[in-house]
Amino acid sequence: MRSFQLLQLTYVVYLIIFYLVFTCRYSQLELHRFMRLSFNNTETAFAYKTNKELQAGRFLFGTMNYAWFAAIGVRLTPFLMKTGLPVHGMIRQTIFKQFVGGETLEQTAKVAKKLGDYNVQVILDYGVEAKEGEENFDKARDQFIRVIEYAATQPNIPYISVKITGIARFGLLKTLNSAPRLRSGVHDHEEEDAEWERVRERMYDICEVAAEKNIGVLIDAEESWIQDPIDRLSIEMMTIFNKEKCIVYNTIQLYRHDRMNFLRMYHSIARQRGFILGVKIVRGAYMEKERTRAEQKGYPSPIQQDKSFTDGDFNSGVEYCINNIDEIATVIASHNEYSNLRAAELLDAKGISHDHPHIHFSQLYGMSDNITFNLAKAGYSVSKYLPFGPIRDVIPYLMRRAQENSSINGQTSRELLLIKSELKRRIKVAKAAKSKNVSLSSS
């Protein structure tokens, strides 16, 4: 009996020694490699939300769960805004508060700080839709630069988002997209050449300040019929600014069936020119518009046959980037749980640090908190895409969020289920605490 107790004691001592050696050898970040990542922890997902905020979210997603109601709201809201009816307050307290950081940088700073408290970073986006005209394009450039300068003063804002349609005329991009001499970088119309040169100068100014301030610039993807000049411009900026570290990123939409080959070609160009390739990998945002236009104009749709092909190429694209992580810096922008888990597991399988500077996860503010905050807790570099701007100006962005949440299969239901689950958990915890206090006071 005594020898058995001695054996038990020895076993415990060995366990303690092993634990001490293990924790000294591995940092907290490394320990996460031995724990299975899960996106089901709602306590972690919504720790930054009050009960009142969760209840507001439950109401909003519950409303958007009815596709017909969301469709009516999308049509009516812009009209009501134009009539001058007092709808600003309602919008501010519902959909605006859910998906937008604030109307000003100062308001947005509070949201960014709150996210930072939970190790979540921010991709800052001035969410105002583009207004055409050279003067407006110059103003947009100046605004992007102001956002970069502000981001540089904050500890958790490593990126800003830029839409080329904010600094370039849509018609010009469309013309250049189909120009026969586009690949050589030459166009036949002197006036449009001069206009394009001004676009290049605006983008250079933005990237130059970003490089000085060490802030990443994520160039948004657009419709396929204006995307080619954007791709060319992004390569030009990367060639200049991505020599030593990644500053400029282009967005690749994998719902297009040609984008995997494009990614490989992009990588080949980066190798030849000696720069780090920066890419933001997304599924895509203009599917219905792309298919409708292709059908109307009688050309083959650039969109994948179905979602399974998109998912396959998205996951293949992420894997390709991770396999070439020394040469490609990647922002994985996805609300798909499987894709995020798969990417995280790939990093672990290859022994790549969760906070490697060439890998970053991101989700939209107001959506998929279960992914964002659980990734952050596990030590991954992850951010919220956080737009800001006056309510009237960000209405188009908000309407897209409403449309996406009502059309993406199961997205709204998933958000609603997670919020309800967390509210139930909090009620249960509160009841248990109350019961414990009653029993203690009675004793």
Where are these regions (language model features)?
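Cationic, low-complexity basic patches in intrinsically disordered or flexible, solvent-exposed regions
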Residues: 6-9, 29
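Positively charged, amphipathic and often flexible ligand-engagement surfaces
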Residues: 13-24, 30-443
